[in-house]
């Protein structure tokens, strides 16, 4: 972990304080009423919770105390407690994305784009495209809003981290085609149900989702017009990794196997020869169209896959996920996300063995990681990406109080270069410190810390037009939660700097801008 490099004066300058230098030790550093220092979590337990969750709040600490580390981990790996506070669930339930059939959205979008293309008037065409784009952006924003509310408030904190991890791993870009209309459905149908489940099921769910098929062009992949984009990324980014021993010929063979895997935006079924009618598959917008499929036999990674319809695709996925390279690739990526930018090879090896032994049981692989000596030794040393930083700051500052406006959170993520559904290329966002620890990034974190610490971020300005919740002023971070779960892992330099804060608001900003708070 980095040492604290800023003096208290420098911190005050960076955060823009105009207060005189006043030490508020009695107000800011004495334990909250009824709290004894002996009740604090150990440093290791506090940091362990910071890693397993998106950051501490009182409910999380209380649940940890009730269960202990082992049973708390069991509960998190099960991922069955996703009940949200009523005020948060009400916000989500009111979103159009919750009640608008996604298939109809896409069918309407395809029809509208065709109508717009046929317009003769350039101004009418421009206005019509703007209207459609605004509608799509509304649905993409609602998908983002829903995911952020879940990340901040769900008791299933590990599951929420894994939803973000897999959403980044199986990245789609909302601004391509009509993906913006599909982003929320992609999370809820292809990612969330399998986030702690079986990796093969997860791969197949993303493979069959129209967001992925639109984003990586497999909807255009047909026997007479091969498109290799998705086949290449399925091997390189989703299952095997780079330099995993496959060849361009393997990519080509997989592309042929994936022909006919596409999207159905028409009501009428394709005309099929009688012998192939039973091979047509339609599930929502997903379609396997035998007329567009290459039924030849193919050889993938040395294994022959006989022509036979969508069963070929399932066979190909089985071949990919059972490769030792796949086990190691996924283990390496999980360990990079949770443990270290360069995770210990011994840990990656152990996780890969669990992956193979369990046939890709994600929860089992995570358990191997969380219960390892290497994981314990890494606590407090993994740099937070913007998503982790922002969500953990809101969780600590407001401690379960329902926010009413997610726009500031979205803006903070955008400003740090990590918007949800916003990564153009399929490789997803980087998970290493060097990607997020530049001087510009640090300045943005200071601004976020100040906005949250001062209470003027606008998080309680109801974005749906209703009355604002009865929350005024700035958050009080020097609470029992701070003394119980945060103070144990702060350095002496940070604790000394906090005593130099000239106001409670500045104290908040100092804490959220401290080096320790940027690590987990």
Model-derived segments and their meaning:
Residues 58-169, 173-184, 190:
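N-terminal accessory alpha/beta regions
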Residues 53-57, 81, 170, 174, ...:
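Short alpha-helix boundary/capping elements
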Residues 37-60, 94-96, 323, 327-358, ...:
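Flexible, low-complexity segments enriched for small/polar residues
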Residues 65-68, 77, 206, 369-373, ...:
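A general structural motif at alpha-helix termini
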Residues 123-126, 143-144, 179-400, 405-409:
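Active-site substrate-binding loop specific to GH73 endo-beta-N-acetylglucosaminidase modules
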Residues 4-23:
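Bacterial N-terminal signal peptides that target proteins for export
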Residues 21-31:
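Bacterial N-terminal signal peptides
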């Amino acid at each position: 972990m980095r040492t604290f490099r800023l003096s208290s004066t420098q911190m005050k300058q960076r955060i823009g304080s105009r207060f005189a230098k006043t030490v508020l030790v009695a107000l800011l550093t004495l334990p909250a009423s009824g709290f004894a220092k002996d009740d604090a979590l150990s440093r290791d337990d506090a940091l362990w919770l910071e890693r397993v969750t998106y950051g501490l709040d009182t409910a999380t600490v209380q649940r940890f105390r009730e269960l202990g580390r082992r049973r708390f981990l069991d509960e998190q790996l099960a991922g069955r407690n996703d009940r949200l506070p009523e005020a948060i669930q009400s916000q989500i339930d009111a979103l159009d994305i919750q009640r608008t059939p996604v298939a109809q959205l896409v069918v309407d979008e395809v029809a509208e784009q065709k109508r717009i293309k046929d317009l003769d008037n350039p101004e009418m065409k421009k206005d019509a495209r703007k209207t459609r784009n605004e509608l799509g952006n509304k649905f993409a924003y609602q998908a983002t809003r829903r995911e952020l509310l879940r990340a901040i408030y769900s008791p299933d904190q590990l599951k929420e981290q894994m939803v973000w991890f897999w959403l980044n791993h199986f990245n789609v870009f909302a601004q391509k085609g009509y993906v913006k209309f599909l982003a929320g459905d992609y999370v809820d149908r292809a990612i969330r149900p399998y986030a702690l489940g079986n990796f093969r099921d997860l791969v197949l769910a993303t493979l069959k989702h129209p967001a992925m098929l639109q984003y990586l062009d497999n909807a255009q992949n047909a026997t007479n017009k091969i498109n290799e984009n998705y086949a290449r990324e399925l091997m390189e980014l989703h299952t095997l990794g780079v330099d995993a021993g496959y060849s361009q010929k393997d990519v080509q063979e997989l592309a042929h196997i994936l022909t006919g895997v596409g999207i159905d935006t028409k009501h009428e079924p394709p005309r099929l020869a009688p012998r192939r009618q039973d091979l047509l598959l339609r599930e929502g917008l997903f379609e396997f169209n035998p007329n567009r499929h290459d039924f030849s036999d193919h050889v993938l990674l040395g294994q022959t896959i006989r022509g036979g319809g969508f069963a070929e695709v399932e066979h190909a996925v089985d071949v990919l996920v059972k490769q030792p390279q796949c086990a190691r690739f996924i283990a390496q990526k999980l360990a990079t996300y949770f443990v270290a930018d360069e995770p210990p090879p011994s840990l990656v090896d152990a996780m890969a063995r669990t992956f193979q032994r369990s046939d890709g049981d994600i929860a089992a692989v995570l358990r191997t990681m969380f219960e390892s000596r290497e994981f314990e030794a890494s606590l407090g040393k993994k740099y937070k990406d913007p998503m982790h930083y922002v969500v953990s700051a809101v969780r600590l500052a407001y401690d379960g109080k329902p926010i009413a406006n997610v726009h500031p959170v979205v803006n903070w993520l955008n400003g740090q270069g990590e918007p949800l559904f916003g990564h153009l290329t399929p490789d997803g966002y980087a998970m290493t410190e060097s990607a997020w620890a530049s001087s510009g990034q640090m300045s943005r974190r200071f601004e976020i810390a100040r906005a949250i610490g001062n209470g003027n971020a606008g998080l309680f300005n109801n974005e749906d037009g209703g009355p604002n919740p009865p929350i005024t002023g700035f958050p009080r971070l020097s609470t029992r939660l701070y003394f119980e779960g945060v103070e144990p892992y702060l350095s002496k330099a940070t604790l000394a700097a906090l005593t130099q804060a000239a106001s409670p608001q500045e104290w908040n900003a100092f804490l959220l801008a401290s080096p320790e708070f940027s690590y987990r």
